[in-house]
From Swiss-Prot:
UniProt-listed Pfam families: tRNA_m1G_MT (PF01746)
Residue ranges that the Swiss-Prot or TrEMBL entry lists as coiled coil: none
Record protein name field: tRNA (guanine-N(1)-)-methyltransferase
Subcellular location: Cytoplasm
Similarity annotation: Belongs to the RNA methyltransferase TrmD family.
Chain residues that bind S-adenosyl-L-methionine: 112, 131-136
Underlying gene: trmD
Organism encoding this protein: Ligilactobacillus salivarius (strain UCC118) (Lactobacillus salivarius)
Biological-process GO terms, alphabetical: tRNA N1-guanine methylation
């Protein structure tokens, strides 16, 4: 995969070399390049922003340096791939979006600053992505989150290919509780089933606990989840347990 990033602060992406992304680069699974689009300004002051027409607070990123930087990337690579604009008004980023992006050969991220963008920049964009209902100073942190979540899904990036498939959200549910040695720590014991060596029972326990955790913490994820008969039975059990606790408090 090739990832291009347009940013006014390329040094902010240094930490990526210390992470899973860095390992992907070392393995030649990923080629990542950061371009400072200030280098493509045509004014003497090297300004990349200007006041908005019609008045208003703040400054807007100009279209010209972004367009010229994108043209340069396209000339070098033959294409831009999917061009992603980090924007609070964009599509909310989640695991399904990461999985979608991980199937692409080329991604280009535009990281903005200031009050916003000249609207004409959006004409070059294929995807607008938001991390949530909040505003960051710039798009760099958002881009790093999207890149990390996407790159770890590429084949052979993680040491164990099952690591990504077993993550929270990958199966539509939160991840089940996990334990390591010792089996008893300050009176807190590892569930006996995990010590049994019975892989079928362990798999069933994990599935049930994954569903339980999702039911308790992120019930919204279950709205589009397709339940098996066994899972429906577990849900009824969770409901009964919930009712008992509520009435017990009363």
């Amino acid at each position: 995969m090739k990832i291009d990033i347009l940013s006014l602060f390329p040094e902010m992406f240094g930490p990526l070399t210390e992470s899973i992304v860095g390992k992907a680069v070392e393995k030649d699974i990923l080629d990542i390049e950061v371009t400072n689009f200030r280098d493509f300004t045509t004014n003497k002051q090297n300004h990349v922003d200007d006041y908005p027409y019609g008045g208003g607070a703040g400054m807007l990123l100009q279209a010209q340096p972004i367009y010229d930087a994108l043209d340069n990337i396209e000339e070098k690579n033959g294409n831009l791939g999917r061009v992603i604009l980090l924007d609070p008004a964009g599509r909310k980023f989640d695991q399904s979006v990461a999985e979608e992006l991980s199937k692409e050969d080329h991604l280009t991220f535009i990281c903005g600053h200031y009050e916003g963008y000249d609207e004409r920049i959006r004409a070059k964009v294929t995807d607008e992505i938001s991390l949530g209902d909040f505003v960051l100073t710039g798009g760099e942190l958002g881009a790093m989150v999207v890149i990390d979540a996407t790159v770890r899904l590429l084949p052979d990036v993680l040491g164990n290919n099952e690591s990504a498939s077993g993550d929270s959200f990958s199966m539509g549910l939160l991840e089940y509780p996990q334990y390591t040695r010792p089996s008893n720590f300050r009176g807190m014991e590892v569930p006996e089933v995990l010590l049994s060596g019975n892989h079928q029972k362990i798999a069933e326990w994990r599935k049930k606990e994954s569903l339980r955790r999702t039911y308790q913490r992120r019930p919204d994820l279950l709205e589009e989840y397709e339940f098996s008969d066994k899972e429906k039975e577990w849900l009824r059990e969770f409901e009964r347990d919930k009712d008992v606790k509520i009435h017990g408090k009363g």
